[in-house]
Curated annotation (Swiss-Prot):
It is found in: Secreted. Its main location: secreted. Residues 1-28 form the signal peptide. Dual role peptide that functions as a broad-spectrum antimicrobial peptide and antifibrinolytic toxin. Inhibits trypsin (IC(50)=375 nM), plasmin (IC(50)=2140 nM), and microbial serine proteases (subtilisin A (IC(50)=294 nM) and proteinase K (IC(50)=459 nM)). Exhibits antifibrinolytic activity by binding and inhibiting plasmin. Does not inhibit chymotrypsin, elastase or thrombin. The keyword Disulfide bond applies. Belongs to the serine protease inhibitor-like (TIL domain-containing) family. This is Serine protease inhibitor. It comes from the Eukaryota. The keyword Acetylation does not apply. The record marks 77-78 as: Reactive bond. It comes from Bombus ignitus. Ubiquitously expressed (at protein level), including in venom glands. Found more precisely in the epidermis, fat body, gut, muscle, and venom of worker bees. Residues 43-104 form the TIL domain. Disulfide bonds join 43-83, 52-79, 58-73, 62-104, 85-98.
Length: 109
């Protein structure tokens, strides 16, 4: 297995000679089949890396903070790896970042 050091946020390993990605430093193995590889050091401020998290649709956010604990989430996958908000933080989907729960913009009705 050949190893390469890449400056990417994620690596889409399509073949041994074709890679796609964004910012962040990772070590990627060139594998024989396509797959997406996320690594811990690509997480942003107030995020932590999780090898196995619920579907991203189930992440606590400013949009669902009031009903998050009372309404079950329908997961699209049983387990995915990636960055999640640290405890006490929720995803602000407008900006895509994790902010303190009490910093969520208030919705006016």
């Amino acid at each position: 297995m050949k190893m390469k050091l890449l400056q990417v946020h994620f690596v889409l390993l399509v073949s041994s000679s074709f890679l796609l990605g964004y910012t962040g430093m990772v070590t990627a193995a060139i594998l024989s089949r396509p797959q997406v590889v996320f690594v811990e050091d690509t997480c942003r401020e107030n995020e932590i890396f999780s090898q196995c998290q619920a579907s991203p649709n189930c992440e606590k956010s400013c949009d669902n903070i009031d009903i998050w604990e009372s309404v079950p989430c329908i997961q699209t996958k049983s387990c995915v790896s990636g960055c999640i908000c640290e405890d006490g933080y929720v995803r602000d989907k407008n900006q895509g970042v994790c902010i303190l729960e009490n910093s969520c913009p208030r919705v006016r009705h």
